[in-house]
């Protein structure tokens, strides 16, 4: 998991009241998951305390840390205090007894309270293997990503998924449908593990509005991260909240159930890697591919870049993935598609199209850099500086020119009439543009009706004076 999203889930936990965290720490599986999410120094300090019956002296902690790392030590202790794992006196550091007891139970296998799930004790007549679970997870997750980038694959995510995408700000309503937002494009830049945590954090936020117990929700998420891939688990130990969650998580590809009424479920690799230290991977399919290989080198290869960008703005993408091609289509004018490659051109219109849809120049540059071909990453500049500068200039151009709907007033009888009416528009604060020499000005649409009424009153007053 990436450090960015570790911080996000930790930030969420740090914001919880002590009473809620104490309830969370009653689950050994949750204690183990929280422990895995902590930075290395925090884990070291905790391991030095959970098998020690006495509080640890502050001086002993200081002795464990180099003088040059004192700032890191203070930050770590602050994090552990916010998580209510540590409390400190002037002389000692005391570990939360509930956390201590249940983390120790998780580490030594003393958990008797089924927090790590209940494996089914009967054989599944429709048992599935790991390859099937991987394919199912890829299919469900990439369906969501395809929908976000506007690729038609014949299937649409469930209403629950669509509501979550809107609630999280990854997509927004437009013309009866949904379109990807700036945050949504940033979401596509993350590895699949980080993407899942993004949606799960938003799910946690939504659960509060739905009056779901956040402790139940978190315990289930952390439990999923500790389950065994390929093992089927019983629903008998799940609360009603967790059974409801299971229905939602099926739609994300995090768990598999053959049918809604099934009394068993299988965690997929998207679930079992939630709290793991697996290297970040860029897509669900690459994650599955790398996870099933025997060597580290294959994992690295699965994540190698595929984009070559030339100084003439021509782009070559060595990919067969419809999803990656659809993402490129958001800011590249694609020209030709071959069996394992697409070509295209980055130009003013394609970048302006992306900018108008909320994607920033920096995000485009980041995407191209992250997915650059190894040959490009070996050069002095990963991307041609001229291309990078031009993409930024196109955004500056968009920032300078803003389109605003307005109402044009012209053909005044004389300059006095023009001046009276334009002055009135200024006083109302609805004047957008004026050209006194040509006796023209533009007002906002909202203020145009008031100006029309003013012109009518002025003309009527002048006619009355003439009579």
Swiss-Prot record:
The keyword Ubl conjugation does not apply. It is found in: Nucleus. GO terms for molecular function: ATPase activator activity; double-stranded DNA binding; RNA polymerase II general transcription initiation factor activity. InterPro entries: Tfb2_C (IPR040662), TFIIH_p52/Tfb2 (IPR004598). One of its GO terms (biological process) is transcription initiation at RNA polymerase II promoter. The keyword DNA repair applies. Its main location: nucleus. GO terms for cellular component: transcription factor TFIIH core complex; transcription factor TFIIH holo complex. Pfam families: Tfb2, Tfb2_C. Keywords: DNA damage, DNA repair, Nucleus, Transcription, Transcription regulation. NCBIfam families: tfb2. PANTHER family: GENERAL TRANSCRIPTION FACTOR IIH SUBUNIT 4, TFIIH, POLYPEPTIDE 4. Component of the general transcription and DNA repair factor IIH (TFIIH) core complex, which is involved in general and transcription-coupled nucleotide excision repair (NER) of damaged DNA and, when complexed to TFIIK, in RNA transcription by RNA polymerase II. In NER, TFIIH acts by opening DNA around the lesion to allow the excision of the damaged oligonucleotide and its replacement by a new DNA fragment. In transcription, TFIIH has an essential role in transcription initiation. Component of the 7-subunit TFIIH core complex composed of XPB/SSL2, XPD/RAD3, SSL1, TFB1, TFB2, TFB4 and TFB5, which is active in NER. The core complex associates with the 3-subunit CTD-kinase module TFIIK composed of CCL1, KIN28 and TFB3 to form the 10-subunit holoenzyme (holo-TFIIH) active in transcription. Belongs to the TFB2 family. This is General transcription and DNA repair factor IIH subunit TFB2.
């Amino acid at each position: 998991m990436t450090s960015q999203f570790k911080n996000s889930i930790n930030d969420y936990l740090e914001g919880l009241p002590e009473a809620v965290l104490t309830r969370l720490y009653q689950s050994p599986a949750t204690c183990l998951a929280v422990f895995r999410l902590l930075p290395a120094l925090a884990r070291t300090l905790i391991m030095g305390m959970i098998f020690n019956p006495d509080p640890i002296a502050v001086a002993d902690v200081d002795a464990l840390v180099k003088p040059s790392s004192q700032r890191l030590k203070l930050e770590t202790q602050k994090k552990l205090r916010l998580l209510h794992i540590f409390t400190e006196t002037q002389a000692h550091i005391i570990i939360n007894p509930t956390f201590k007891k249940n983390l120790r139970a998780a580490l030594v296998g003393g958990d008797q309270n089924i927090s790590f799930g209940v494996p089914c004790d009967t054989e599944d007549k429709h048992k599935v293997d790991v390859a099937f679970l991987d394919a199912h997870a890829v299919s469900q997750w990439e369906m969501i990503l395809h929908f976000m980038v506007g690729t038609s694959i014949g299937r649409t995510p469930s209403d629950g998924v669509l509501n979550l995408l809107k609630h999280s700000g990854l997509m927004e309503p437009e013309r009866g449908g949904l379109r990807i937002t700036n945050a949504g494009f940033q979401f596509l830049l993350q590895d699949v593990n980080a993407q899942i945590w993004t949606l799960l954090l938003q799910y946690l936020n939504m659960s509060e509005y739905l009056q779901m117990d956040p402790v139940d929700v978190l315990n289930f998420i952390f439990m999923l991260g500790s389950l065994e891939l390929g093992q089927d688990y019983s629903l008998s130990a799940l609360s009603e909240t967790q059974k409801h969650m299971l229905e939602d998580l099926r739609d994300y590809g995090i768990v598999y159930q053959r049918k809604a009424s099934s009394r068993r479920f299988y965690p997929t690799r998207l679930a079992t890697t939630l709290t793991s230290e697996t290297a970040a991977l860029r897509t669900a399919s690459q994650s599955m591919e790398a996870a099933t290989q025997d060597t580290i080198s294959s994992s690295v290869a699965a994540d190698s870049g595929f984009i070559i960008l030339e100084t003439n703005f021509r782009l070559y993408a060595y990919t067969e993935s419809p999803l990656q091609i659809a993402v490129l289509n958001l800011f590249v004018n694609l020209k030709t598609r071959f069996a394992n490659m697409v070509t295209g051109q980055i130009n003013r219109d394609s970048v302006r199209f992306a900018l108008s849809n909320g994607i920033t120049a920096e995000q485009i540059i980041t995407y191209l850099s992250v997915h650059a071909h190894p040959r490009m990453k070996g050069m002095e500049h990963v991307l041609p500086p001229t291309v990078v500068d031009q993409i930024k200039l196109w955004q500056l151009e968009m920032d300078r020119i803003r389109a605003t709907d307005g109402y044009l007033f012209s053909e005044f009888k004389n300059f006095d009439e023009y001046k009276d009416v334009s002055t009135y528009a200024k006083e109302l604060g609805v004047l957008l543009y004026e050209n006194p020499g040509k006796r023209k000005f533009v007002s906002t649409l909202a203020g145009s009706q008031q100006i029309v009424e003013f012109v009518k009153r002025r003309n009527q007053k002048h006619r009355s004076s003439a009579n």
